[in-house]
């Protein structure tokens, strides 16, 4: 067996609770399996997107900007644009209509959609403006449902496919952040 990591964790992920020590480990039937696993782990470290991203100058992070908030550099943004064009082209072939929606919405939008009760703990805190509470958008579907509900539709128009490669924001705990794989700012469709 091998101890792979030691870290701290709050009981039930609540900062008000006691800090516990978390120990991660792996076990194998024999030494050969352990060595094969260690070799695979080393190969995975060499392929880690954070290492490759830094070496190829694709993206960067900086604590001054904020943890979990990656910035794409010119080399990475070229790849980003090519992927986005490819995805949008495939969606257009399948009848998707592309839209653009705001990065914020009212708390009431998320309460109406039913997302508030399930996702508010993973949302950035609400901002108060002119007597209304707004949040950074954690997902696209509530905005898209408002576009759908904007006018009546015949069953003959169905299905209506709405696409948007949108910037979304979730308040992920710092222990779960991992380069562009898991961040507090990301794009999804």
Enumerate the predicted regions with their spans.
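A short glycine-rich beta-alpha junction/loop motif
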Residues: 185-187
